[in-house]
């Protein structure tokens, strides 16, 4: 889990711009199906952002 969370920051640009575009983080969740627990967690995070 920790590795997946930090994956979008290793894309080569600084952390702020990577998060602003949201490419790596959102792409990973779109590519693989979530377990029910992960889906619940993802919804909560979206609301907090």
From Swiss-Prot:
Domain of life of the organism encoding this protein: Bacteria
Comp. bias (Polar residues): 8-20
Chief subcellular location: other
Region (Disordered), start-end ranges: 1-49
Conditions for induction: Expressed only in the forespore compartment of sporulating cells.
GO cellular component: endospore-forming forespore
Subcellular location: Spore core
Family: Belongs to the SspO family.
Record protein name field: Small, acid-soluble spore protein O
Organism expressing this protein natively: Bacillus cereus (strain G9842)
